[in-house]
Amino acid sequence: MERVDELELLMEKSFWQEAEPSAELFQKKKVEASFSKIVLSRGMDNRYLVLAVDIVQSEEGNHEKHLIITASQSLEYKELCILRNDWCSVPVEPGDIIHLEGDCISNTWIIDEDFGYLILYPDMLISGTSIASSIRCMRRAVLSETFRSSDPATRQMLIGTVLHEVFQKAVSDSFAPEKLQELASQTIQEIRHLKEMYRLKLNQDEIKQEVEEYLPSFSKWAGDFMHKHTSTDFPQMQLSLPSDGSNSNSTCNIEVTNSLDIEESIWSPRFGLKGKIDVTVGVKIHRGCKTKYKIMPLELKTGKESNSIEHRSQLVLYTLLSQERRADPEAGLLLYLKTGQMYPVPAKHLDKRELLRLRNQMAFSLFHRINKSTGEKTELAPLPQIIEEQQTCKYCSQMGNCALYSRAVEQQMEDSSVPTSMWPKIKEETQHLKPIHLEYFSLWCLMLTLESQSKDNKRNYQHIWLMPASEMEESGSCIGSLIRIEHVKTVCDGQYLHNFQRKNGAIPITNLMAGDRIILSGEERTLFALSRGYVKEINSTTVTCSLDRNLSGLPESTLFRLDQEEKNCDIDTPLGNLSKLMENTRASQKLRDLIIDFREPQFISYLSSVLPHEAKDTVACILKGLNKPQRQAMKKVLLSKDYTLIVGMPGTGKTTTICTLVRILYACGFSVLLTSYTHSAVDNILLKLAKFKIGFLRLGQIQKVHPDIQKFTEEEICRSKSIKSLALLEELYNSQLIVATTCMGINHPIFSRKTFDFCIVDEASQISQPVCLGPLFFSRRFVLVGDHQQLPPLVLNREARALGMSESLFKRLEQNKNAVVQLTVQYRMNSKIMSLSNKLTYEGKLECGSDKVANAVINLPNFKDVKLELEFYADYSENPWLIAAFEPNNPVCFLNTHKVPAPEQVEKGGVSNIMEAKLVVFLTSVFIKAGCKPSDIGIIAPYRQQLKVISDLLAQSSVGMVEVNTVDRYQGRDKSIVVVSFVRSNEDGTLGELLKDWRRLNVAITRAKHKLILLGCVPSLSRYPPLRKLLNHLNSEKLIIDLPSGEHESLFHLLGDFQRK
């Protein structure tokens, strides 16, 4: 699913949810934003709600923080948690969720420096790497979590990744020198590493040579720590484990016996941590005549042998993660691959305590990214304090964002404080930016953060551990009780094909479909998030998934669950684009000038100066097939120096126009980056383009690409041509003038070295500004294609919407009229249907492409026979509403249900109208009996509950497969007949949000080619301004027909009689 109607669901919820008593607000103020229900529990996985926080003074005169907490859903049974020593500094507040480790005696927990831990927001899982990096600078760690794409790839990172993989393969195979050479060669030839070499402009042979320098150390390490004859042959080390007791000798010999797992992914909702352990190894600790066996994390480092606090801290955190799967390892092993030197790292209580306190500080900063006080405006919260370590800042990858956030956000606050020594650096990093640029950054940063924190938009996965699969299955986003069948097939390194079946019975009804991203977990609590991947194939008995880990090592009896990986609001990419827009580069400066400063776009005067002589005949031939507005669009784009906006009104052949534009640009020798928000929109253009034998490169995950386009994907080309060298990959990237991807695919390495002559963005009016920005950095000129009179960008958060987040870049730039070309000749609607949109939205600009289009009516070959039946059952010729609805020569009618009556029903599930639903089914069944194909009929309703009611009634009737969907799903598509059920009908004047949106109404009334039937209660719908305007027009044209008054049961009887016939 690419673009779903979450906005509609959100608006529906806002209508039928009751207001909560203010007394309960404090309990839910943050919890509700994280999860729809407060899930509390005792025991090992306890989750407590904090009800009150007090600072008290102990008898010894020390300050303590006393928390009144409860694990009771009814909030009746309360307990006390006493925080002592440094735990007092944990920024815990009423309404927070916490997890406690320790002992509870007489309903009292005591957490102090010697015993116990408190985990704040345990459902927020933070990586061990992030926490370790926060030791030197908490601000950098928080920025890296926020602006993820700003941490650039480096040569050393690539070499580190390759070395990790070689070591990990060797530990499961052999450390023989010739084997290591073979593994290194194979690993360097893998496409993902070649792509990084391309990004970083590296030489493949040089990288191979540098990797090979490490290999002797690999063999040395294996010789030292594996496969010796006696325990004394292993190196001596100093390691004391708590379980050995305080009197134990710390000297021991360490033997690594075997590798149990590679890149073991562990999520720990107990400690609020997540991470991937490089290698999980079995270790024998020989101490005198005693031997102890432990399973430990082995962390690999490729940089300088520092045994630094960050490196050691990572291992300490991995010991906590390991406890989710097995006994406490009490220590970990730190191996520097350059030298083969290995250090044991004990996990002492003090270290774990301080690291978990750091984790809590970081969680607090990430959770409280918004400051919102009652009656005050919402604003971004300040980040952790800027440190005064210029050497650390000098090499910090987040320095630009640090300074930018300080200038744009924090320095606008009254209590802003920046260390004096850092002022010159902040000024240097941001001096190229005007105040208006900083305001743009601050506003969009706020709106994106608000959107990401919407209840229906949180990118949290706590349902995996908080809700059983059986419950989640009801939502359609999960399948539980799965067992693995057949052998795991290795597609390539990092892709493993797994087949699953339900342990008992068939696969339940689900929303999961091929191409959907998923997270695979075990049903038991120790096996959260074992692997990530996507659904390859799904049917009633089997689910086939491509996963990033081979799970064949788990017992055959293991029960699994699949959870859909929702990415409704992936703000990493738009925040990265926003940050990039503020950079001091030529491309960013140009976009700031055009987008923020509204510099007038420039145009060339004569086509002859841009049209190559050899391309003139080809271009002229292509132009012959276009109408006048389309030809004007081609000319405007060719003459542009900056950008062009093409307004694609309904039915005007937007996709054909884009395809033609690409053909012309290709003929002129221009390079083109073709993008859109959805994969389907990109592929719709490519499907047309492929017919003209024009080559292109399609980027993106192959499972998301249309089957007929997959042969043009990078993945398929690399596979079919067996590309294993950087030279061949470069040749592929340089061979195609046209590259296509979605707006979210702009982190691909090709964009690090390629600038296109033109970037074309389809669906531009539906894409939020920071997302749309992404591809524009990589082109000299851009073309936005859309129509802001149709669906806007999807924004779930009301506050973000009110601040202006639904303004697309297309809408923002449309004020420069000289850059706008309108496509006004449409080939979809007949003249009567078109007139509605002309009156409502387009001020008479739309025109039919031909008389044939203007006069087209629905073809119903069996209509005469059906008319006779209707005459018999319903006195057809005496019923104006039946004539209006079914006569082919009446293309438009509004059936007013006010007198029927047809009241709405408001339930927890949403808003529906059973009478309208039955009318829709009746109308549909008549049209099908009259000879219309089910696939030529579209049913639209604004509320999901109504869609469900209509779908259920259709399933019970003899009607075939008719598409029932929301307006959002019909954007860009059409049907011969469209029936719209408006649902709302009440006496109390209640208004919902959905029908207030004139753009949705415009889309709804422009989907039909030959017949448009609107159903609703005129008095109720007249309260909505957009509908009032439409109804006034329909009334003036005498197109509103009142359904007969009287007992509505008799009408139901009539409909039933006809359907049974």
From Swiss-Prot:
PTM per Swiss-Prot/TrEMBL: Acetylated by EP300, leading to stimulate the 5'-3' endonuclease, the 5'-3' helicase and DNA-dependent ATPase activities, possibly by increasing DNA substrate affinity.
Catalytic activity: ATP + H2O = ADP + phosphate + H(+)
Cofactor: [4Fe-4S] cluster
Top EC group: hydrolase
Residues involved in ATP binding: 648-655
Annotated stretches, region: Helicase activity: 520-1061
The keyword DNA-binding is annotated on this UniProt entry: yes
Family note: Belongs to the DNA2/NAM7 helicase family.
Descriptive protein name: DNA replication ATP-dependent helicase/nuclease DNA2
Record gene name: DNA2
